[in-house]
Structures are given as structure tokens and as C-alpha cells.
């Protein structure tokens, strides 16, 4: 039987006892954070090895320069403006799922694990969910079979009066809280969470291999997200400081996971993809922030530094070693690609933005498709081929900037990294990302090259806008009452807290 | 017999018929221009392969952020402030050898080929010499046996009245001039010079192999120096535009040269080093300028973008494949390393700044040594370990900057990329290049880390300054009469021009 059903084969193992599995690594890291992508301290031997054995994507994008919307896009294959992971509280404002958010992933969305489940997959998420923390948004209600991790970011510590510490779940119930039961030392940066997440991954893989069940593992760790942390054995080991320590621990973990797959003899049956949910947060640099290599700005922006991501596909025996692809890729493609590997069809009742990358990965094809750069409710920029047109520019407001909040530290391109929202709808700013990957030299409006490229891109925009049906925005309303006061399982632990009265209001999204 | 005399063995081949040879590639390219260093279009498969088979240096420096002084430093193993390749016409001004320069490499300097000659080497320079073009500075008077290339930059075309076109030499005599006999089409960027230089290299290597003579080949090409050029077959083939076309042609040439060594069976007897004489000239970006990856600014500055260079050592069978070194290295080390390979001692009557890198390359050792960043006559900055202290900062003057001359386009770090020369002697600006490779976040003066690091670096500076004997500055005087009016051999070609009367004056160095 054809082994093409590699990743997401239906039901039980094939006659050949092929185990068909998939793993996605997702974390907050910049394009320039890996040795294979030119990080000058070159401290990621395992990821570099993964790249050498697999395929490196140099033009791979997230769907949004912020965590929650990107993750929602990955799991639904749809832009945040469709799946509801955006806000209309302000123009072009980024929004995510802090613990006072009321919204989350709508039931109407079909998530990758829900679809894979029908094909017999056991799905596990390890790490940060970030698609809403109220009961109806729980990952096990959206296709995952297992979960170990947290619903929100590991911010804290909180005082349990104004704000409870974020819970950590095992499956349906919480098993403790960050800073209380799962320590993060903000002074030293020590926390053993990555080790816990690693062990979870290894155990899950072993279990699936033993039971010969195909699996989908979504390893969504967050050690490189501020507050950055690393285990004791990695603290102080990097040239890059605490952030580098965290990267090294993740690199080590990836090596151990890939090695585990090989030891168990299932590496040729496991499609693994490594990428990030947004660019490095330069606002946290250098202590807690990574590198976007030669690209402009970082997280929160629709410049390349905010949305171009490191990406590696690994599947020994199928993907030729050492491959390099210039395919314009998106995290949303992982949705479509996984379905394709499973022999499943994507849902036909809705627009799917992801494309099937298998022809790219297995046959080296290049598929012509645009990349849309959204910030909240606004289409800020579009890339087609090597051209990128900005229809709106801004980094953040003067007000924020004057307080020292800087998404582009050390970088300033006049008229480009603007601190007011500037519209360029009628004369978009155009860059050639081959000659000018750093978006520093807008093409002359008068040039023929400009006119040809903009004409093409504007056609794509028109088509996109004409067919766009925005989803109900999920990230508009906040309410202290919905915070993690009494998550399921809190009673057993004596960790239930009293919620304040409900007082829903518009969330404030400053940038 | 021990094969340790690999590179520069004395006299004729050993009993084992070992041919001991060396090649240095030197060109104007930025740290971030190679795929192996994270260039996002990854168009250098041959150089990346060279790195995979050899050792990648991530912390390798040139001796000056400008061409002539760097090349003089490489060939003498000495800082430009010692060998005379600097100016005292203005404080901290860069200077080089345009065709009206009066000075050049002093006879008192001992060049690498002069020393190797004594050990039986045949030495050839292909490409740009740049150590002075008046008769006494001719490369064949300084140890080279053969030359094909030009004494100065390929600027032009000139009108032969105000300024003659730069000659191209074969050995002692000119064989034509740029733009006249060696075409460079400034409109299309077409020129077949790299192909000529490639063929010269292949022929020279073949000849040396046939005669079993050890050789030193210095392949100092200049296609990536503005005006950037490429051969017809490479024009339009790069994502990166003309600059990328030139890089691709160089990459292809390097591949052909390494392949030739392998075909001839002498790759294991040939130590090859690839590096650059200064960072990418961002002032020429994006059309004619490369990338310095994550580093600050470019050519002309003493920020990392101006002086940290791509560097690869290749020596199959000796250097373990895939090695990566964090050794602080310098182009001046190529002088000392080559002598060491030849079993020769460096001259003992003068200060040599280069160190022998063999323990690093062959045994993976790390040698503690500082890097001094000079701009003209001023020590601007010093690196020790991961710390870099700036004693002076400036990019260029406000006057130049206001005319659009920008060495840091899109980059601006307050108080760092200054447009006045700012002295920090008593409180140097300190950066940790591991956590902050982009030199964007100066350490707090009050921190213990600052005090410890600056104390150490200041000790190194004191020691360096106390023993420094500056050479007679060679780049102070310019005179139209010394231009390439009638280079040797011009009579045979009918290409002699009449020189104007001598009118020496101080050269003007704007930055």
C-alpha cells in the first residue's frame, strides 16, 4: 500500500505496520535565531542538523505578528480575520488571549486535530494553547485527546487577588499554577518547564509507538517568550545570555525528540515541522529577545522581522536531505499539508488559506501564491514573488514609543517604520525582498518595475478583499470575571479562587 | 616526513611528492552575504559547501573597514597604523590608494610572498593589488612572481584628460585599461573580468601542479565592489539583483577552483582561506551593496558590520569537516598562519599583530587575544572575549549624511551611530556581542559587569598603546602627476598619456 498516507493515515497502522505521525514544534523565535539561519553564535546544533537532514524554508511566514492569532491560524488553516482571532476595538491593533479575554476559538471553526481524529489519530498538545481559556474553548473540546500545559502566557507572578496565576492543565483539569506549583524564578530565569514538556513529548511518542497508534503532537513550548526561562543545567551556557540559554535547551530538546523517533524506528513515519508563531520580540532584546537576522523590526509588526519565521521540515527517507525551498509558505499550510498527508480533504464549506506543501516538499515544486500580512482587522501588506507592497505602515504610536516601547530598536527607516498609522492604499510602498530583504529602500513610484509589480499585487488584493467574509471578532471583550479563578480541578487542589463580579468591557489593545 | 609543513614547505616537493600550497580568496563582501551565514536567498552553494567541508569562523575580522589598509595588513601581518596604511590628515579618517596617491607599501615592510619566496614558493596575485601603484610599489617588487590585475579600484570610465583609466597588468607591464580594453558596462553591469580571473587561477594552479612547485595564490577579485559587475551568463540570475549576480559568479568560481584542486589531486596539499577585506558597503545598497547580516552599519565604520567578515578555512584531510570556531581571528593571522605552515618564523625585528591559527584550525583550541578596530590613526574600539568597548564613535559627518551618504541605512542607534566624532575614552561604550550582536544596547556604566569588562579591556588598550610605534603614514599626500598616465608597457600599446605637472597636496579624506 502506498505510504503516501504517511502523516495522517486513517485508523490503525497499515499492514506494513507503518506508524503515521506528525509533530509540530512551535515557539516564539526569530528567523535569525538558528545557526542554520545565520545566528552569529551558532548554538543550535540539533536544529541545524534537522535542517541538514530535512528541508529549510527561507520564505516561511506566520499568519499574524502575535501569538494567539498565529496559533489559531495554524490549527484552522485560516487567517485570523476569518477565524475570529482579531479585534475591531481599534484599527490595525494586535490582540491576543490574556486571561481576562472573553472570546476564544469558536465552535464553528474546524481544527486540525478534530479532522485528524476522524482519521484515527491521537492528538496531543504540550505547552501553550492560547486559543481561549474558558471551558468551551478547552483544547480537548476541539479535537485534542491530551494536553499538558497552560491556556495563557506564563506571565506572573500574580497576587491571586487582582489576578490569579495561570493554571497548568493535564487534560481536563488543572494540576497546579505557574509560580506556585510550577516555579519560574524571575531573578535567575530558572524553570524546569522545558524539561517537563520534553519528557511529556518523549513519553507520548513512546506510548503511541507501543500502541501502534498514529499521533499528532503539537509541541507548543514557550521558554523563549518573556519572561524567558531555562533549566539549571542550561543557565549561563550560552553566549547570548538567558534567551540563548532557553534556545539551547529547546535545541537540545528537539535533538532528543528526533533521536527518540529514530531510536523507536518511527522517524521515517513521522513528519516533523519546526517553526515559530511570530518574529523575535525585539522589545525584549537583548536580555529576553531574539534575533530576526537581516530583517526589519520584530513581533507586533508586519515588517519581515515580525512575520518571517525559521522553518524546517523533517521526514527522513522522504524529504531529501539538505533541501532549501523559496516557496512562500505559511503556518496555515501545515493544516492543509497534514490533511493531504492523511488523505483527507480540507473542509469545503469555508475558505481555507493554507495550501498543501507536499508538492514543494517532496517534488521541489514552487507554487505561486501571495502572503497576506494582517495586523488586527487590517491588511497591512502583501507579498507576491519577491515583491512586498505595504498598504499601511506603522510600528507603534508616538505615545508608546516615547515611553521606550520600541518594536524596531536600532532600526528606523524614514516613512516606513512610522509611529502614526500611515495609509498607502493608492500608492503602496513597494520593496524587492531579494535585493532589499531589510525593507529599507522603497522602489521609486515612477519606475516601470513599481507599476508592474503593484498592478499585479493590487489585483490579488482586490480578489482577496472581494471574497473575504470576516469572522465574528473574538478578541474585543475583556472581563476580570473570566480569569482563571477556578479552573476545573481547582477543588481537588484547594486552589479555587473567588471571581469578581462580571464587568465586561472593550479590551484595550495599545498596538 | 611529517606533513605539518603542508602549506608553505621549503623548496621543492617532499619525498612524498606533497605539493604544499595556499590560496587566499579576498573580496569585498559582508558577513551576511553567504548562505552559510544566513543570507536569506541562500545562493552560495559552493561557498556553503566549502564551509561544510572546512571550518567556519564566526568571529573573524578585517584590520580596517576599508580595502587598501586591510590588504596591507593581510600581507604584512601588521596593523595599518604600523605598516603605514593610514592617514594623519584628519582624525579617524579612512584612507586608501586612489590613483593620485603618492604613497604605497614601504620597502621596509616584509610581505608574506617575500618570505614564502625564500621557502621556494611561486606567488601569484590575481586581481586588485591596492598597495600603491607607483613603480616602487609594484607587487613583483614585493615578493610576487606573477600578477594579473589592477593596481587600483575599477572606478571609471575616465576621460584620459583629467584622469586616466586604471591599467590592467600582466606581471611587470600593463596589457590594457579598464573600460577601454577590459570592458565594464555600467548600465547593464556586464563584465567578464571574474571569468578572466577564474581562468588565470585555474591555469596557474595547473602549471604549479605540473611543475610540482608549491604556490601561494592570492585571488583578490573585486566584482562585488561598486561598480558591481558580472558576466553575461550570471546577469539576472540572482534574487538579489546585480550584487547577487556578482556573488553567484564568485561562488561559482570558488567552486570551480576547489574542484580543480581536487581533480588535480592536490586539495589535501592546499590550504585555502576565504574572507573579505571589509564589510558590505551599505552605502551602495541595495543595488550594489551586500549584507552584514545582524550587524550594525557597514564598510567605513568600526561597528561590527564594517569589520566582521565571513571566513572559511578549507583543507580536506586536515581540517575536520563542519567545524565552527569562535576564535577571534584577523586577516593578519593569515600571515602568521601561513608562515607557521611553511615552518618559517615571523620576522623578529618588528611587531606582528597576526597570530598562528593552526592550533585553532587543527586542534580546536581557543586563543585569548583582543581585536583592535582602527579607523585611520585612531583606535576606535577593542573587542576582548564577547565584550566590545568603543572609545570613539562616529559613522560619518552630518554634512555628508545630509547629502545622503549613509553608512548605516535604516539603522540608527542613539549615541552610537553618531554623526560627530564622539570620544568615550573615560567611559567607553560597552556591548556584549553575544547577547547583543547588533551593538544596540550599551551596558549600564554602573553595572559590575561593565566595570569588570572595561577594566580588562582598558588594560589591553594601555599595553597596546604603550608599545605602539606608528609607521610613517603613506596615505597623506596626493598628486595628479602620479596617476596611471604611463604605466610600464604603455608604449607597446600606444596607451601612454601625458602627466600633468607635479602638484602634491594633502589628500582629502571625507570620512
Where are these regions (language model features)?
Chain A
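Formylglycine-dependent sulfatase
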Residues: 2-428, 437-476, 480-511
Amino acid at each position: 500500500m502506498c505510504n503516501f498516507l504517511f502523516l495522517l493515515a486513517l485508523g490503525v497502522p497499515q499492514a506494513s505496520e507503518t506508524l503515521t505521525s506528525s509533530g509540530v514544534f512551535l515557539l516564539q523565535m526569530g528567523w535569525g535565531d538558528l545557526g542554520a539561519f545565520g545566528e552569529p553564535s551558532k548554538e543550535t546544533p540539533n536544529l541545524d542538523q534537522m535542517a541538514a537532514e530535512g528541508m529549510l524554508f527561507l520564505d516561511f511566514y506566520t499568519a499574524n505578528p502575535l501569538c494567539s492569532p498565529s496559533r489559531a491560524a495554524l490549527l484552522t488553516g485560516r487567517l485570523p480575520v476569518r477565524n475570529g482571532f482579531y479585534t475591531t476595538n481599534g484599527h490595525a491593533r494586535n490582540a491576543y488571549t490574556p486571561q481576562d479575554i472573553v472570546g476564544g476559538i469558536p465552535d464553528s471553526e474546524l481544527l486540525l486535530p478534530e479532522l485528524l481524529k476522524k482519521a484515527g489519530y491521537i492528538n496531543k498538545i504540550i505547552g501553550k494553547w492560547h486559543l481561549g481559556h474558558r471551558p468551551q474553548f478547552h483544547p480537548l473540546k476541539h479535537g485534542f485527546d491530551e494536553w499538558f500545559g497552560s491556556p495563557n502566557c506564563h506571565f506572573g507572578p500574580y497576587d491571586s487577588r487582582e489576578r490569579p496565576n495561570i493554571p497548568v492543565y493535564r487534560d481536563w483539569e488543572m494540576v497546579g499554577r505557574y509560580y506556585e506549583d510550577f516555579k519560574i524564578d524571575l531573578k535567575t530565569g530558572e524553570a524546569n518547564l522545558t524539561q517537563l514538556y520534553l519528557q511529556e513529548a518523549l513519553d507520548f511518542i513512546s506510548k503511541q509507538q507501543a500502541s501502534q497508534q498514529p499521533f499528532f503532537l503539537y509541541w507548543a513550548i514557550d521558554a523563549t517568550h518573556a519572561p524567558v526561562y531555562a533549566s539549571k543545567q542550561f543557565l549561563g551556557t550560552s553566549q547570548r545570555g538567558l534567551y540563548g540559554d532557553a534556545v539551547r535547551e529547546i535545541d537540545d530538546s528537539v535533538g532528543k525528540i528526533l533521536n527518540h523517533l529514530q531510536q523507536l524506528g518511527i522517524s521515517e513515519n513521522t513528519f516533523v515541522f519546526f517553526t515559530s508563531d511570530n518574529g523575535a520580540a525585539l522589545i525584549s532584546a537583548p536580555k529576553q529577545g531574539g534575533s530576526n537576522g537581516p530583517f526589519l523590526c520584530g513581533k507586533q509588526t508586519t515588517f519581515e522581522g515580525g512575520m518571517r519565521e525559521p522553518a524546517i521540515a523533517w521526514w527522513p527517507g522522504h524529504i531529501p536531505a539538505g533541501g532549501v525551498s523559496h516557496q512562500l509558505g505559511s503556518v496555515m499550510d501545515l493544516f492543509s499539508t497534514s490533511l493531504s498527508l492523511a488523505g483527507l480533504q480540507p473542509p469545503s464549506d469555508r475558505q481555507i488559506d493554507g495550501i498543501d506543501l507536499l508538492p514543494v516538499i517532496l517534488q521541489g515544486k514552487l507554487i505561486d501564491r501571495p502572503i497576506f500580512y494582517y495586523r488586527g482587522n487590517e491588511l497591512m501588506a502583501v507579498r507576491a514573488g519577491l515583491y512586498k507592497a505595504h498598504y499601511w505602515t506603522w510600528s507603534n504610536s508616538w505615545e508608546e514609543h516615547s515611553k521606550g516601547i520600541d518594536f524596531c530598536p536600532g532600526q528606523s527607516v524614514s516613512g516606513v517604520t512610522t509611529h502614526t498609522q500611515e495609509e498607502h492604499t493608492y500608492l503602496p510602498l513597494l520593496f524587492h525582498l531579494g535585493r532589499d530583504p531589510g525593507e529599507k529602500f522603497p522602489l521609486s513610484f515612477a519606475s516601470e518595475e513599481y507599476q508592474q509589480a503593484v498592478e499585479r499585487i493590487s489585483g490579488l488584493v482586490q480578489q482577496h478583499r472581494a471574497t473575504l467574509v470576516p469572522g465574528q471578532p473574538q478578541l474585543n471583550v475583556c472581563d476580570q470575571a473570566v480569569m482563571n479563578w477556578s479552573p476545573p480541578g481547582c477543588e481537588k487542589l484547594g486552589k479555587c479562587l473567588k471571581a469578581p463580579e462580571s464587568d465586561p468591557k472593550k479590551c484595550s489593545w495599545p498596538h
